[in-house]
């Protein structure tokens, strides 16, 4: 056991086939990836697991992880952030991530604890729907991407969103969280 995360051994990542650490949290992430492919019509190749993202806050810098990044037709269309517990407390850092992960505003942001989900409008932050079943199907998300422009994010906004993300994900992280790396 490392910190408070119970290590259950090794498991095979559903999307990549790689061997990864088996934890309760990872089991939720794997179930979500499987749901996206088997129920929502996504291809495994549409979904990037554990995408690393560098964020800065002044002279501080860290690498964080985006649990699932969905890319359709070379556009980052949706990010999914997992975290146990309350969903509402995870809205703001997920929205910040959606404004940093690409040079444009991501259309859909999903916050989930593995049992429930809030699907957020990337630009406004408003809740579009609730529940794991309400995560958009691949074709719906693709249609949305084709009909909405990819609005660029200004450098000033990116800097502010990185600071927010740093505060939530790095400053407030558990010391045993090995997905966060200060650089």
Predicted regions and their residues:
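Short beta-alpha junction loops
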Residues: 112-116
